[in-house]
Amino acid sequence: MGQSGRSRHQKRARAQAQLRNLEAYAANPHSFVFTRGCTGRNIRQLSLDVRRVMEPLTASRLQVRKKNSLKDCVAVAGPLGVTHFLILSKTETNIYFKLMHLPGGPTLTFQVKKYSLVRDVVSSLRRHRMHEQQFAYPPLLVLNSFGPHGMHVKLMATMFQNLFPSINVHKVNLNTIKRCLLIDYNHDSQELDFRHYSIKVVPVGASRGMKKLLQEKFPNMSRLQDISELLATGAGLSESEAEPDGDHNITELPQAVAGRGNMRAQQSAVRLTEIGPRMTLQLIKVQEGVGEGKVMFHSFVRKTEEELQAILEAKEKKLRLKAQRQAQQAQNVQRKQEQREAHRKKSLEGMKKARVRGGDEEASGIPSRTASLGLGEDDDEQEDDDIEYFCQAVGEAPSEDLFPEAKRKRLAKSPGQKRKRREMDRGRGRLCDQKFPKPKDKSHGAQARRGPRGASQDGGRGQGRGRPRKRVA
């Protein structure tokens, strides 16, 4: 019999391949898409649609609660390898979209001029193409008109490029490109158009009948005499099935693409179908850091050099005060630790001295204060156990003459000393809280006939006495 299962070499190769895949996945940029504040149902749905665009390199089931601050999200993003935050928020007048780069910034703040959800875009199309396999790979980013219009435009282009993994046009697998994200910059209006498309590659140069045969759904040829009628005239096909192609979307494929008729070095047409969402954005400001920092660019506010210098000085003063508070807090913590350590040492020394003093008193024969007052804990527990045993066996409290030491020890206790706990654990029963009754015409002979623990010798069933009552839990 041959060896079953994989060999050692196969297992090692599989483990190395998995490790390489994990490293490659971790090297790609990842993102969080969420909302902040009271945004409403439509903005929340827009955030879900944008999250759909960023798949699969995003947290698809991310839930951010109201009590979670931005610092909490940043703290979680570090161990998970998240590099970007896409945050949607809403005020009374406008909707804002923030793009943050972690961990040190910058932060780009956009105003959402117009937007359309996925359901709005899909409902306006006659035929839409959207399936789950399209979202197994990140989209292809296309930037248009991001020319030399300023440093802020260049920064925007860099931020959008870093959202997705880079590709090598000579080594990329065309089967992994299923979607396209187009961002177009209009220099006149200074607005960005955000569009999301689905990519479909179809062969060209074939008749409509041949295209119909290549589709998965076979056409109805019950009215035809021969298949040549379908290929020659395209009978039974509507004019709406013919999609116009031209030089703008026809190209020669460098490699075979999934689909019927898409062979290598053959002419094929690349068709785009919008699947949403849409957004029209306008850059408001660029900040250093994550959410808070120096404003490097603002579309509406222009500050002079004096104002910028005053802002810088105020920020430096704030940082100095913060450093002073942190230093003072560290000193306070150190001082409290030293005080705690000194108190602990002093307590240990006192306990040691008390132990030595007690040993000297025992060696010299001087009774302690507790022993002189007759308040030994062992004697108290012994006496209380005897009283409890008598109550359980006889069913009533013992007489005062039977346990004379109990009363004397209670009287000897100082007022400040805690009384012994009267109620014992549930498993041991309860002590009798009744006072010692005076003896009623009982002779010394009757008392002498009792056992060593106060119980009668006949098992508690003396003359005129019934069975002992059950112990009260």
From Swiss-Prot:
It holds the Pfam family Brix. Residues 323-473 are annotated as: Disordered. Residues 376-388 have a biased composition (Acidic residues). Residues 29-292 form the Brix domain. Residues 407-421, 464-473 have a biased composition (Basic residues). The modification Phosphoserine is found at S238, S240. The modification N6-acetyllysine is found at K438. Residues 335-360, 422-444 have a biased composition (Basic and acidic residues). GO terms for molecular function: rRNA binding. Keywords: Acetylation, Nucleus, Phosphoprotein. GO terms for biological process: ribosomal large subunit assembly; rRNA processing. It is found in: Nucleus, Nucleolus. Disulfide bonds: none annotated. InterPro entries: Brix, PPAN-like. GO terms for cellular component: nucleolus; preribosome, large subunit precursor. It comes from the Eukaryota. Residues 324-334 have a biased composition (Low complexity). May have a role in cell growth. This is Suppressor of SWI4 1 homolog. It comes from Pongo abelii. The lineage of its organism: Eukaryota, Metazoa, Chordata, Craniata, Vertebrata. The gene is PPAN.
